[in-house]
A protein has these predicted regions:
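C-terminal and inter-domain tail/linker signature
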Residues: 1-130
Length: 130
């Protein structure tokens, strides 16, 4: 049987992949969630609160004209955290992104409270989104 936080992550990834922002808002993200995106691109930075995080997701979809995709390769979960191995891809202005990222989730009371995104190639990610 999977850990409850693994189930939460799998449901969250499914909601993200299908564009179900209401499920992300109501079932996956805490109201005061923090999301950290490294780098120097226009999307890099810290997003605070559910509206900023969902706005970040919308910006990624907008910049890639809906081509951005994530896969859930694997999830490692315990009572406080989940670590996700997640290939991502997208198209933007003639550029293609293929990245094997890692995301670290802090989870409390069945909701994601903080996320740290770690692209495998930060330089390529910055170039793609710049």
């Amino acid at each position: 049987m999977a850990h409850p936080n693994e189930d939460l992550i799998r449901k969250g990834f499914n909601a993200f992949s299908t564009g179900d922002m209401e499920a992300l808002r109501n079932e996956f993200l805490a109201a005061d969630v923090k999301y950290h995106v490294p780098g120097k691109s226009p999307i890099s930075g810290d997003y605070n609160g559910i509206d900023e995080v969902l706005g970040f997701f919308a910006k990624v979809f907008e910049l890639t004209r809906g081509t951005f995709r994530v896969e859930l390769h694997d999830v490692l979960a315990n009572d406080d955290h989940a670590v996700v191995l997640s290939p991502a891809s997208g198209q933007r202005e003639g550029k293609t992104l293929h990245d094997n990222g890692v995301l670290v989730f802090h989870i409390k009371d069945g909701k994601t409270t903080e996320v740290w995104l770690h692209p495998s190639d930060l330089y390529a990610s910055d170039e793609f989104f710049s």
